[in-house]
């Protein structure tokens, strides 16, 4: 390789943005599920990021992080309170329109996040995991995304690793 040749082992755009999602997910204080999201313009510029957590002003020291079983008190579980990574990324965006953008997520979006993705004008979704594929929320999500013409596809891990030491 001459000094004028470009490096051949640079990470791809998908690797880069999914890496940002993974790093964002590490900001979540949820002990059981950490999700990250990254919204990108058609020309590969990061527009916004988000992770799952409580809304502004709702202390993560006061609100519950517990999961809930059907017979338990729903007010003492996280589900009524946590804002999902996708919605946080959409709400964190301070620019104009998200029309035509791509959202990268570490977990396939639920039906509520799918509504926000569709309404915001995002046209492509890249996801890492789809572990809740058989749930009504994800089935409804896919139905809406399909109807709205939002393209989605799984991220294809390359097996490469990058180490970050803090």
Describe the residue ranges of each PLM region.
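Zinc-dependent deaminase catalytic domain
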Residues: 1-166
């Amino acid at each position: 390789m001459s000094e004028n040749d470009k490096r051949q082992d640079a990470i791809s755009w998908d690797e880069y943005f999914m890496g940002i999602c993974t790093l964002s997910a590490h900001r979540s204080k949820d002990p059981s599920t950490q999700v990250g999201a990254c919204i990108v313009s058609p020309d590969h510029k990061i527009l916004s990021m988000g992770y799952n957590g409580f809304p502004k002003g709702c202390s993560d020291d006061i609100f519950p992080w517990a999961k809930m079983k059907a017979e338990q008190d729903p007010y003492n579980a996280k589900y009524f309170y946590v804002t999902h990574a996708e919605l946080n990324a959409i709400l964190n965006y301070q620019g104009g329109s998200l029309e035509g953008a791509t959202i990268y997520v570490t977990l396939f979006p639920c039906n509520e996040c799918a509504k926000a993705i569709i309404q915001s004008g995002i046209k492509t979704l890249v996801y890492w995991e789809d572990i809740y594929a058989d749930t009504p929320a994800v089935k409804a999500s896919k139905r809406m995304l399909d109807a709205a013409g939002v393209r989605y596809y799984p991220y294809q891990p390359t097996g490469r690793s990058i180490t970050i030491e803090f």
